Amino acid sequence: MWFIVFLLLWPQTPPELDFNAYRAHVEPLLLEKRPGHARCVVCHSTGTAFRLQPLPKGQAAYSEEASRKNFDMVKKFVRAGHPDESRLLLMPLAHEAGGTEFHPGGKHWETRDDPEWKTLADWVNGGR
C-alpha cells in the first residue's frame, strides 16, 4: 500500500514538447484564418509578449529556422503536461469554458471540445 501512495506523491516528469509535432500540428493553427478573427500571427508578430516571427510576404508557411524561433516562444506560454494551466490554450478559450476573461484577439474556441483546442492540448500533453 505504501508503494502506491509513494508513486502517487512522487513528482511526475512533464512530457517533452516535440518540435516536429509543433511544426506539423500547432504552427498551422497559428496561421489559420478564422471567420471574424485575424490569424494569430497577424497580432502576435508585433506588439505582444507572445511574439511570433512575422510570416514573410507571399509565404504560406515558416522556414525551419523561423519555426524553431516560434517554438521557443510558444514553449514560454505552455506548461508541459498541463493544458489547463497553459496560456496558449486559455487566452483564446471562452471564459465560460475556463479560459481567461479577456483576449484582445477574441475567443476562438467556445469549448474544450473544439478540435483545435484538443490538438493543442494533445501536444501540450506530449502527443505527437
Predicted regions and their residues:
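Aromatic- and Gly/Pro-enriched helix-to-coil junctions and flexible linker segments
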Residues: L9-R128
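Sec-dependent signal peptide recognition
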Residues: M1-L7
